[in-house]
């Protein structure tokens, strides 16, 4: 795109490419010359005929002739007026082009970023692949989105999506969200004319945690439900006939809601910083909610950030639906505007404790150690819950000295590991924080220094990471690990092979979740964070479907009425979803999973 075109787009928010294209298709069959295009652009930017002549080093008469003989007749035709009515009157022409009803006025995406806030409908990427060709496509896509050129943005987002599928067999959920957002913006007038309502949800994820892996897992669930909801409308208006959407078209379609609506997603980066005095991300997002027409917030990831952020949303009448934070402290957060899809620490700890005690039932006594981050309210919550349930079995357990500093130096944690090894530890419960301090998860890798065949390692849901599989694989290269008796487990809310809610269960929503997930991300690449994120959006959509909520305040009241007063439930990927008055789930799901060797795929996997 030429520099002068960009000037017109950025200064005037006019789709100059569309205008020039339409001018070439008037009854005056003479196509515009490059000179004509330059004259039009400079005229729109306010230059006089003489100034244009001087700039292009031409005679003023030449500019006059091109305007009179070729440019004005074409412009007059698309405006539906006589040439004499607009000749020389660029203010009138400009007013025509800036009238949204005439189709040339661009609607650029809002600039949201500042020093303490990063958010995107498509203006920027957070998840970049190693391949630089794909990065270039992503960069071009965001440039077009910034300018409000949504068709071009859509094409480049789609090319980036296709290239990642081709190279890695896994799509980028951020690209899929931006494809959906671009389609909504590009066809906005069509949807408005047909009274299709667009709902905007903000999703707050920690891109800095674990190299963006957790954010990607959450966004897979978000982008998948966005596509599933939007495709009903895209298909109704045959949008795939005008632009190639085969790469994202669901091969098997399942309807989640009966009435066609559209879902637009704002992706927000949460720095996830434990030592920030208050949540600036939440404060800024709450301040923007009216400007952005936000209906609800999905987030945050860590319990600490969720607790700090909640008051900003509550003060604005915004519903906060949480998919990943498990601390018991969140139970008393709100009686109205908070809903939690994942399983609280108290429930997880009880399930894990029961499993551990059944595992050692035949032993006289077992030595147990707890490793966690004492700075984290989540880790403290989980640790306290585990201690409460395990102390009921004091005659069967010997509690070794605890390690509350998994977040500190590698060498200090290593020394602790060596000490409990010498003490003959039988079980370790490891509770990394939710990415608040990077050493926490990195130090969890020290488990590979233990004799894994003789010690049971039990982790919380934050321990459920691909990193653990990589560490086991690396350790397997240096010493022989018994592939049948490796003892690493975790307690999580959902798994791909869950008997009740997995890919082969009787839960139809979970079945389709896995089938579409296989198409978009490859088999088995949806995990508990993806599933609870999907369900977090689903509870919002089900209430919108029933009450046709128009505003965030109306949605808050409708969700409170439906789930907390009437005690209604819906079916989601993670099973029946019903809430207590506190916003916690009734009978939340738990699954015990273990690291096992997959002989066919020749790799370690988390499995039931």
Set out the residue ranges of the language-model regions.
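An N-terminal, helix-rich hydrophobic module
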Residues: 2-107
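Extracytosolic ligand-binding ectodomains
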Residues: 111-608
